[in-house]
Amino acid sequence: MIGRSPGSLVETAEAAQRRRRRRAWPPALLVGSALVLVTFLALPVGVLLLRAIQPDAVASLALPVAAEALRLSIVTTLISLAVIIVGGTPLAYLLARYEFRGRAVLDAIVDLPVVLPPVVAGVALLLVFGRRGLLGEPLADAGLTVVFTTAAVVLAQVFVASPFYVRALKVGFAAVPRELESAALTDGADQVQAFLRITVPIAFPSFVEGVVLAWARALGEFGATIVFAGSLAGRTRTLPLAIFAALERDLDAAVALSAVLTAVAAVMFLVVRTVSRGRF
């Protein structure tokens, strides 16, 4: 065996140390960059929550305006959610289990509200349901007005939130093995029984995820609502619009209402994470 000289051993050790330094540098850079972004994301929310627990902010939640906005948000989002479930469930099943001409186009239409700016969505709804819109004019002739009413709030929420429900439930339906449904039919179950006994239990976590995501999106809707429904206290001023209105006259109320939405968003996030990890 040929031994190495002390000089070569020193050079080898120095080279190994340099390699370790090179390997150690990228993780340090990654951690530093990540820390900057995480701080940027967490700091505003933390300051908001700290400000929200101040006595003046807490007291503002008892104001009639705050209670009215909260009530309107809950009522409209629950109605919107019911509409989304009734219309979105068969649509999600259709997209997940059937191949047909035009399926890609239908899929793209479902995704469109996600990428469409909310203000643009409001303008589009206005062109359809406004007093001189495609459907709004004949409705107005029949004595029915949609724009700047609570119904307009619901329509705006349904428009922007539907894709979140359909997308989540589509994934759940697609994950159901067809063999299980076929076995249920072979055992004597009809289509409805197979759907209720096999498909629904397997897709249920995706259903919960879709409901939570759609409800959270509807609850936070602002742009389409203010364009299409306006900001009328007691009629169309939901929580996001009440926050915007309060910024001009009562910062404490805006902070408190913002904290309420933040808390709801946090709960919704935890529910989605729990369901997605299979711990429901």
Model-based region annotation:
Residues R21-P55, P64-A174, I198, I202-G223, ...:
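Membrane-water interface segments at the C-terminal ends of transmembrane alpha-helices
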Residues R101, E179, A189-Q191:
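Short coil/turn motifs that cap or connect alpha-helices
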Residues A184:
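The alpha-helix within a helix-turn-helix
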Residues D187-A189, P201:
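Glycine/proline-centered hinge or cleavage motifs at structural transition points of membrane proteins
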Residues L213, V227-S231:
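Short, glycine/charged-rich beta-strand-loop motifs at protein surfaces that mediate ligand recognition
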Residues L232-A246:
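Short hydrophobic, aromatic-rich alpha-helical segments embedded in or entering the lipid bilayer
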